[in-house]
Amino acid sequence: MTRVTAGLKIVRVVAERRDPTAPLTVGAIARELGASVSATSRLCSELESIGLLERAEGYGAYRLGREAVRLSGAAAAPFARSVRFALTLAAQQTGETVFLVAGAAGTMRVVASVESLWTLHSPADVGEPVSGGQSAVVRAAERSDAGLDAAEPRYLESTVGMTIEVAAPIVGPGGECVAVLAVRLPVNRADQNLSRARHAVAAAKRSIEHGIEEWHARVPDRGQSAPPAVPHAPGETPTALAAALRILRHLATGRDSVSGTARATGLRPDRAQRLIDACRRAGLVWAGHDRSHYQLGWIVQGWYRAAAAPTMVERGKPFVAQTAERTNTCGFLTTLKGMRSFTLVEELEMAGEGLRMSPWLGRAHPIIGSDGGPTLVMDLDDDEVARLFPARNTRQELDVFLRRVRGVARDGVLTMEAFDDAGIVSISAPVRDASGTVVAAACLVGTTAHMRANTVEFERETRDLAARVSSLLD
């Protein structure tokens, strides 16, 4: 195993967990890879120097680095919005957990998920490994639509324990399976939801594949017209791992040939080929069906998603506390969970003696009455929001909601009266992750009198809070 392959496998061990920001010791990494502690320690130190890892609390412990998060976000950026919409719509249609799985070098992990809001449900956490020959997900990964009779279903099913899986491969333009889309539901809801799950998987598969086709049409193979070489100091010869990172960054923006990659990264073609081969052995790069072009594997796309929530909770909480104290308001960070707003962080300050704000930490709220609801879906167009909007709400409520979505998309901040709480005004602004999509809403909430008297200042504070939290994620 080359040094580059070993180093990138270390990154995968750290990155492909439910929480890649949690400390992982050199000893644990070495045991996972069957390597010596001393060699692993040296590689971790070099990976830290180029930003793929960073030091964590505890002796000899590491967590995922900023460059790895940026790489992951860049790889997901062309597909993040369409994947999010497809998974959220399928979750709305079924009420069950909908998720995307990608594989590399013999392992498969969840890279995106919208979890069911039922109390009893079948989970699928980002970073979770998927294995077992009985699993519909595993079997779907070995199959494409090629050669299927028109009458054959485009999905596979399995029952393991008390969980049913309905899965279908996401097929790229070359016929390769780039990922697997699936729904998980408890056996006891099969009569109610299994048929819905089948239809939802088929529709979401078409939606995601259409997004992939559109992107490939916009970004053709670059082998004949590579961009200019990346800037670097004259005479600079990057280390093998630093050069591999250049290649990964380049392939995150689209597939390319060896010669195109060499030109774009400022590396010799022979060195670029060796490094691409090392990246392939680590499971991060795929060869195209004709072996003339290479691309980043979809498993990388799970890294930034798994890191987002724990980063906001750990590192974003002090920012929320400072802003809430400075403005004498309640501060929140909320994310989208299905079509509900879910509170990750809260600081309950309040203007007014004798007043108290009820806590929302760890609770979900219907999006129609959520402080950050319109902000959380501002990346979607009106038709997509309408398709996701809960059927129990009226057309008038949808129209009001859409006006607010358009307002925050235009202004970058939204001030609104609480939907069902008299005397409260909220201000929200978008928090964006490494893919550039909205991952959370930063919200300030207070009494109507206090918020209206300070609207301009508090809108600025909310934008600043959102920008500071966004900077943690990219």
Features from the language model and the residues they span:
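N-terminal helix-turn-helix
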Residues: 1-73, 226-307, 463, 467-474
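A structural microfeature
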Residues: 51, 110-112, 179, 345-346, ...
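Sensor-regulatory modules in signal-transduction proteins
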Residues: 170-173, 431-434
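Juxtadomain coupling helices with adjacent low-complexity linkers
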Residues: 145-153, 160-161, 177-241, 401, ...
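Amphipathic alpha-helical effector-binding/dimerization core
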Residues: 63-146, 305-389
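Short, basic/aromatic recognition patches
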Residues: 78-92, 136-168, 196, 208, ...
